[in-house]
């Protein structure tokens, strides 16, 4: 019996070391998600408001998920150091829930990527039709056009169907150089062709999505399946600790 305890102790020590390392990496993942959520709320709010038909809580979901992972990452380290079988089982159960949630989110994002593109087309077209240069969505359109050096949905001529165009012409945010644009030029599509950006914003955004979708999906599934490693380590460690406790009785 004593020899078996001697055999299991090195295994337990090894599993504890691996699980602590994993939990630390898991904790870092939570910090990254939390940072991305805050960054997305502060920086990408204008883009998100145009991609989503209704108000979206995506940044808050990332912040909440990141915070939860940070807490459970610390819990995993504590449970590992404490060597508590029930805590390790609880940690494994949480990792399984995270795995399922990330897997569903990754599959949904990949399957519905075309719906996301269609939604962006509808919302951006609607934002152009209701553009007045002052409200939040109008400022979002201006921000996208300036930051991406684009104009309109497909191209700058899309603005000719907007009520704003009849009074003000193409928005100055379309100009390659706003100091070189005047209202008269922006009222004339022929003259404006030499003053404004030619590429449409829809093509730029969707081409970026298509180009990076494989990378994003690969990273998402990689992170999701990494939870299986943590689940395996936590379950194995819990089993060995329980077995070792029985051997001591």
Curated annotation (Swiss-Prot):
Q: Which InterPro entries does this UniProt record tie to the protein? A: Tetraspanin/Peripherin, Tetraspanin_animals, Tetraspanin_CS, Tetraspanin_EC2_sf, TSN6/7_LEL
Locate the transmembrane regions by residue number: 17-40, 57-75, 87-112, 214-234
Annotated membrane topology: Multi-pass membrane protein
Q: Which residues lie on this side of the membrane: Cytoplasmic?
A: 1-16, 76-86, 235-249
Stretches of the chain found on the membrane's Extracellular side: 41-56, 113-213
Keywords of this protein's UniProt record, alphabetized? Disease variant, Glycoprotein, Host-virus interaction, Intellectual disability, Membrane, Transmembrane, Transmembrane helix
**Superkingdom of this entry's organism?**
Eukaryota
Q: Which CDD domains match?
A: TM4SF2_6_like_LEL (cd03161)
Q: Name one GO cellular component term.
A: plasma membrane
- Tell me if Acetylation is a UniProt keyword of this record: no
Q: Return the similarity comment.
A: Belongs to the tetraspanin (TM4SF) family.
How it assembles, according to the record, is:
(Microbial infection) Interacts with herpes simplex virus 1 (HHV-1) UL35.
Q: Which PANTHER family does UniProt cross-reference here?
A: TETRASPANIN (PTHR19282), TETRASPANIN-7 (PTHR19282:SF257)
Identify this protein by name. Answer: Tetraspanin-7
Per the UniProt record, the source organism is: Homo sapiens
What gene does the UniProt entry assign to this protein?
TSPAN7
């Amino acid at each position: 019996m004593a020899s078996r305890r001697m055999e299991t102790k090195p295994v337990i020590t090894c599993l504890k070391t691996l699980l602590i390392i994993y939990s630390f990496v898991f904790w870092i993942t939570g910090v990254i998600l939390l940072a991305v959520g805050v960054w997305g709320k502060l920086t990408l709010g204008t883009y998100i408001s145009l991609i989503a038909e209704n108000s979206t809580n995506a940044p808050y979901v990332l912040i909440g998920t990141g915070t939860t992972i940070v807490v459970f990452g610390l819990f995993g380290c504590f449970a590992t150091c404490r060597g508590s079988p029930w805590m390790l089982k609880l940690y494994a159960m949480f990792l399984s829930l995270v795995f399922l949630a990330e897997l569903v989110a990754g599959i949904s994002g990949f399957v519905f990527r075309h719906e996301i593109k269609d939604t962006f087309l509808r919302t951006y077209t609607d934002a152009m039709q209701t553009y007045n240069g002052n409200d939040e969505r109008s400022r979002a359109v201006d921000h996208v056009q300036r930051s991406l050096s684009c104009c309109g949905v497909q191209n700058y001529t899309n603005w000719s169907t907007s009520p704003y165009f009849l009074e003000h012409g193409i928005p100055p945010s379309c100009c390659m150089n706003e100091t070189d644009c005047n209202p008269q030029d922006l009222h004339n599509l022929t003259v404006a062709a030499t003053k404004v950006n030619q590429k449409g914003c829809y093509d730029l955004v969707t081409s970026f999505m298509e180009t990076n979708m494989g990378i994003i999906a690969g990273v998402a599934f990689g992170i999701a399946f990494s939870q299986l490693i943590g689940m395996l380590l936590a379950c194995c460690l819990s089993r060995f600790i329980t077995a070792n406790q029985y051997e001591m009785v």
